[in-house]
């Protein structure tokens, strides 16, 4: 409860407001945080802000990152279910008005073979600002319930990334992904895009991501595997070493400069949660260009503040 609200309404009202906040989150929890439209948030709390991506002239924070988070959820679902659903559209999402927030995303996906479409719900939690460090807690068709608790504390985390190996010659430890396999395993490209956009969510656009080219991708697991070891492509716990070029939003070098990133993924068999952590190797954090004044005074953020405060929207 916000202390300014207690000061405004007095101690007599504080207990009542606390009960209203508890009731609000109980109602939010009924849909696991995905369907909060029409749930009135009491003053003094930190409610989920709802964004309808289908509204005319819809503005919302981090549109590129939200789409990547939606794809990360589908990646987790496909990995576990042996499917190949692709993102068609982000329909809506909810998040907190905080630097780091869980994202509750409702999306439309399509099976590229049958062409059938299905609505999914995805929850992605962020753990670090300006670095790719996330956990996919929920990834399911909309009609399926997983009994997750909204905003429950999560203890599962990914270990620190390893050093870049001196070579990848150990065939029992490493697997070099073939170019044809890159096309059929677009999650590798997804990981690369997530690393870059997580570092600089304000500047990188879909157009920037379309120019990226993976020069080499190598996969490693902790278990030695006799070559040929294509099975590493489907390992639930793995380290991915990616060399790429085509990145134009950089201070050092240009789009022809080859760069490196390491991504570690760990799947928790007990909870079903997928955690992914990645970083650029030998480069500054792109978040150094993060301008809080620009970000928190952007039209999308100002609109979110008005929603949070219960004020009517105003034209920009």
From Swiss-Prot:
Residue ranges the record marks as coiled coil: none
N-terminal signal peptide: none
Family: Belongs to the UPF0725 (EMB2204) family.
Disulfide bonds: none
Taxonomic placement: Eukaryota, Viridiplantae, Streptophyta, Embryophyta, Tracheophyta
Short name of any one Pfam family annotated for the protein: protein_MS5
The protein's name: UPF0725 protein At1g02770
């Amino acid at each position: 409860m916000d202390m300014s609200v207690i000061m405004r309404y007095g101690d007599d009202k504080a207990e009542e407001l606390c009960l209203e906040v508890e009731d609000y989150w109980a109602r939010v929890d009924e849909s696991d945080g995905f369907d909060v439209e029409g749930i009135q948030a009491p003053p003094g709390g930190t409610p989920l802000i709802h964004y309808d991506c289908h509204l005319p002239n819809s503005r919302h924070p981090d549109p590129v990152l939200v789409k990547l988070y939606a794809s990360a959820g589908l990646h987790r679902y496909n990995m576990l279910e042996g499917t190949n659903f692709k993102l068609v559209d982000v329909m809506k999402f909810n998040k907190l008005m905080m630097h780091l927030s869980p994202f509750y995303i409702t999306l439309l996906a399509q099976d590229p073979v049958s062409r059938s479409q299905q609505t999914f719900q995805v929850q992605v939690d962020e753990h670090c600002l300006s670095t790719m460090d996330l956990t996919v807690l929920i990834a399911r068709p909309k009609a399926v319930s997983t009994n997750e608790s909204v905003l429950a504390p999560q203890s599962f985390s990914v270990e620190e990334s390893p050093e870049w190996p001196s070579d990848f010659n150990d065939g029992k430890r490493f697997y070099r992904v073939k170019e044809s396999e890159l096309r059929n395993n677009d999650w590798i490209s997804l990981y690369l895009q997530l690393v870059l956009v997580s570092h600089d969510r304000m500047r990188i656009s879909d157009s920037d991501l379309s120019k990226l080219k993976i020069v080499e991708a190598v996969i490693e697991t902790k278990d030695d595997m006799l070559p040929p070891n294509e099975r590493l492509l489907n390992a639930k716990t793995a380290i991915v070493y990616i060399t790429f070029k085509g990145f134009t939003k950089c201070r050092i070098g240009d789009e022809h400069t080859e760069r490196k990133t390491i991504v570690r993924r760990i799947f928790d068999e007990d909870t079903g949660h997928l955690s992914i952590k990645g970083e650029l190797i030998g480069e500054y954090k792109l978040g150094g260009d993060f301008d809080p004044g620009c970000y928190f005074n952007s039209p999308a953020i100002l609109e979110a503040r008005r929603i949070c405060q219960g004020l009517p929207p105003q034209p920009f």
